[in-house]
């Protein structure tokens, strides 16, 4: 017992230190934040304990300045724990921490062309992306987030975000924006965001816009429950061939240009999308020209106001089911199906077009369409029908429901419909408000097989609005077929007369 008592007396300070260390939580950083611990023999031992600096939030402006100022440009960027930084990596001087007086120091470490972003003083700490992570790593934008040229970000081939905690982020718009110009080819081929926590994010617009060299992108675990904006999200991701989108889109209001210029996509499953809140589908699938099929049959479009160019240049689509679309609130259908070259059938017979003001180029260059039922279209509010049916392979058109009193543009309306033989109209088809001759220029140009109801044949020198008339009505020539017994007032008591100079 005497030996034990003597041992305890001689080593009491050491034993107390062991007890103190045993009470410190695992993962606490040592060496920066210091607290004195007084022991019975008056020896003061300094032990590092955690304080408020357990929050390592990245300052996005400083991060981009560091990348831009590198003497050796980086081609790979890794967000890692301090323990994962290679031992021979050089620490750069700038502290990449948020200016909140609470965040611990975050440094960039470089070895060759690789950059590692990690906490400076805690081997196991996680890095936090800021609440507003818009333009986190981006180029070619304007605003007060950062000034100057940051073009070196274009040289990055790899970005891996294993230790980037995004649980606090609310805004991811433009997060990896690489520009919308097709000439701005970026080097980025690998972007690992598979571990992103997106539960609090409301905006993902332009998130991957212009990442034109990405061949794959794993967003399958994204929680999009609170996202309201997905516009331009994958715009110009030209090298992607597929996307696994297990998205909850119930709150999304804007899907405009979401997949525009994803020219490499060969498959895209959006069949489970809840689009009940969406208002804009402008350019949504524009130029997805490698898709051969696209299931949008379950889309709820009751709140959509614009479908402009929605399927424009989907040159590989052979079938497209839009028969369930609710379009009562849509005002713009211009170029909606333009350049759908290989569509052989299209059912738009149930479309409610009562609020539509523009149908310009709506079916332009649907070159495989031989039939199209638009006999129920309500066009009473349409102002432009420019190029509406141009370059289609239709043999006949029933436009008997068309009220064109408000239409001011009919240029190229039937341009190069070389197989068209018959156009049926009622007396509500008027050109009275197409007052500028250029607005009916080449209206019937190239309709070589077209014949009016009383036998008036197509004449290549007679192709403007003058011949948008029921053939034989009031003893005048025209290319339309219709009832000759109705009033020539053309359906409106205040309709202007049609000049046949």
Could you describe each region identified by the protein language model?
Residues 112-128, 139-170, 181-202, 212-228, ...:
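Structural signature of tandem-repeat unit edges
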Residues 24, 255, 281, 307, ...:
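Polar, enzyme-active/binding microenvironments
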Residues 1-11:
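Bacterial Sec-dependent N-terminal signal peptides
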Residues 35-39, 44-149, 157, 161-165, ...:
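N-terminal capping/linker segments that flank leucine-rich repeat
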Residues 9-53:
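Short, polar/proline-rich extracytoplasmic segments that appear immediately after membrane translocation
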Residues 134, 173-174, 205-206, 231-232, ...:
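Register-specific detector for alpha-helical tandem repeat solenoids, activating on a conserved position
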